[in-house]
Amino acid sequence: MILFDKRGSGLSDPVRQVPTLETRMDDVRAVMDAARSERAVLWAGHEGSRLAVLFAATYPERTNALVLYDPTARGLWAPDYPWATTDEEWLRELRDIRERWGDRDYLTERARWMSPSLAEDDAFIDWFVWYMRRSASPAEAVSFYRMAMEGDVREVLSAVRAPTLLLHRPAKREEAGYVADRIAGARLIEIGGLRDWFSWADPQRNAILLRETERFVSGVGAVPEPDRVLATILFTDIVGSTERAAAIGDPAWRGLIERHHAAVRGELARFRGVELDTSGDGFFASFDGPGRAIACAWAIRESVRTLGLEIRVGLHTGECERLDGKLGGIAVPTGARVAAAAGPGEVLVSSTVKDLVAGSGIEFEDRGVHGLKGIPGTWQLYAAIDA
């Protein structure tokens, strides 16, 4: 068994800025590498379930199974996700944490809200106040709360192929059901008697969770080699390439394209991108994290500008099929269509990419709703702005 404290919690160092899901996913992989664990069953609770879902979809070859307790797919309220915290509640909570963290009256109120069944237990209240005061400074508490609220993996749930067990309290029935409905073959078990946040501290209730986990894990057989993976797809295209080639002639254009390709490949290597194809003057590549893909797109754009070239870039995160070392599936043409909709010098991304880098500090400008040729539905697109 491997236990580790997420950034900003427990014995891990305080966070200077809110880590993204992608950064925290890298932490999971680093811990597994350090422990020489090639594959593992991931057990995560509450907002940590979003991290586990993203890891399982991105690294299916390293995930034997998932066990999620009171899972959440999104931290903030949305019309189709009414169980999450509203913007108003979130802002009020951030203000209270910033202004009142460490205050006994505030922490007592918070303890009674989180664990109403223990509201009159003076020993529990004393412990909770002691625990919260020593767990984080006000600034660290704000960062941790922001980390818990930001991030949205609703579009990733269907990409999880690992056997999945969801354990939940009765109060979380609908939210857990939402997650279970979107993970193929997921098993849902309601644990009666778990009324609030700190019920898990009850040894009897905790034993129930452990028993259900053991029963599920013992029944997980050999996991086949995955043929699908969550990836961020990148497409680039040189703006005005035909006119430029005609203006400078074929020999000069070939030399310029060679320098362009070298520049792109250098940035792909720097940001752990995988080159999948080149078509004329464009590149098709994949990444295991959307934040790295955006950073790489910006770097490519600046690098080729030194050659007097302007590009457009499109990014989309989705489930892909592995085909003889290549990636296929609807996510690939979707990424290509996003790139086609980008303006000169623009890094255009789908809403899925934007949701997955929440908390990164990356700024986006809304580019409206688009129909992408050959792709069902309409798509909200955003330009990633390099500050």
Which residues are covered by each model-predicted region?
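Short linear capping/connector segments at secondary-structure termini
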Residues: 126-130, 145, 278-283, 316, ...
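Long, domain-scale regions corresponding to catalytic signaling modules most often appended to membrane systems
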Residues: 222-223, 385-387
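Catalytic NTP-binding/metal-coordinating core of nucleotidyl cyclase/transferase enzymes
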Residues: 219-298, 302-303
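Hydrophobic alpha-helical membrane-association signature
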Residues: 24, 209, 256-260, 296, ...
